[in-house]
Amino acid sequence: MEERSGSFLPELPYTNRGVIRQKEELSALIDWCQITIKEVPLEAVIEDVLRIPMELMTVTGYEKGIAGHEVVAIFDNIKVLKPTGNAQYQGFQILMSGKGCRNYENFLQLNEETWFDFLNRVCQYHINVPRIDLAIDDRKPYLSIPDLIVRTKEGLLSTKLREIDFHDSGELKEEVFQSKGGSLYLGSSASNLRLVFYEKGYEQNKKYGTELDENWNRYELRFRQEMAVSVVQELLRYRDVAGLAMEVLNSKIRFLEKPTGSMTTRKRLYPTYQAWAELMKDIGKVKLTMQPQKKSLQKVWEWLEKYVAPSLKLFAEVGKIEKRDYIGNLVANGEMNITQKQLYDDYIKARRLEERG
């Protein structure tokens, strides 16, 4: 993708675009990593476990976290939390959302490591794994999410997961419904396994105003508690993310075709939906990939370009006529909020991180 003319972002470190298409039709990611480490001091969690230089982390005065935890140290979306209230134990929790995992891949690359190296190191400590997510990005795509939703409604799904939900937004064009971002949820949000199939390209477009990629689906496997612990053990044993994902998917769900020329109602005799069979066949070839990026500052810039730049251009032209620097005055009198100050601090730290590399 060509850079926008005049963009300063190619000169910034640590700001890889989140909209660059991957060459692979299928790729596998670790997309959430939440690990509790007991009886280890904060500095050791940061420098020995995460292997992030202490000076790059912001040690907070305790910020609200999740599930009885407070944030005590942070670098962008990589967070270290301390238990509070009923969750008391001696130790800390590492929390990396999807964005945090992409942030952390910068440090993995800097340390010439992989996710397997990190997980192996973590397992040398007394740990628990509240949650870990695996994600398959499908850019072919093999599946149509709206079609999966229709099949689910029609009962053409065999699954051991009891709770099913779906969301399909769209619009009518010439009396034909066209999807603009469908999602299918199998399993409850509190269960040890939840599968989520959704149109990632539409989600990114709605959230950030990025270029719409209609051919980008994401299939997430969200593991919690005992199953999350087992997943980490299996990842270290076989070092095969896609193989593990395929094994879980094959054991939990199967999308079906209505049999022709048969009156049977026994789903186990229904043939497998061809597109699902093709995905299961090819997903076993996928290797774990890393997509290191720090997208927060990039998103601000994209928002400025799309929504603010036209108005700035207007007042810049008016200023030329009136001999007034409207834009300069705006900048001089503006004040950053807490989030923007954090973005600036992260940017400064990112430059220092780049200098180390």
Residue ranges of each PLM-predicted region?
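Structured, helix-rich domain cores that form ligand/interaction pockets
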Residues: 1-295, 303-357
